[in-house]
Regions:
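Non-catalytic accessory segments flanking enzymatic or RNA/DNA-binding domains
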Residues: 1-107
Length: 107
């Protein structure tokens, strides 16, 4: 199990980090905070068996809006749909898991 999270930074409006951790999200925020002058804060998260798959799909979906690394310029509507999109990708992962030929996609 792991978490896909959506973080904000009070110095960058409409720019959000989409990442994953297998540990506590609070610890991940502390790690990221040391390299940032702005306050990093949690907006939302999704606990899942498929964190890598979901994160990869988010990054592909929002690639055109990528700023630096895992930070993306998103609209407020996209931020509000974070959980809905996580669930969509999770459902896709479950379908792929049942397909012997597609299992490697989840790794």
């Amino acid at each position: 199990m792991g978490y896909v999270y959506l973080l904000g930074n009070n110095e960058q409006e409409n720019v959000y980090k989409i990442g994953i951790t297998r540990g506590k999200i609070e610890n991940r925020i502390k790690q990221l905070q040391t390299g940032s002058s702005g306050e990093i804060y949690l907006i939302n998260y999704h606990k899942t068996k498929y964190p890598f798959f979901i994160e990869k799909n988010f990054h592909m979906k929002y690639y055109p809006y990528q700023t630096i690394g895992e930070w993306f310029e998103l609209t407020s509507d996209e931020v509000l749909k974070f959980k809905e999109i996580c669930q969509f990708f999770e459902n896709n992962a479950k379908i792929l898991e049942e397909n012997a030929f597609a299992k490697n996609i989840l790794k």
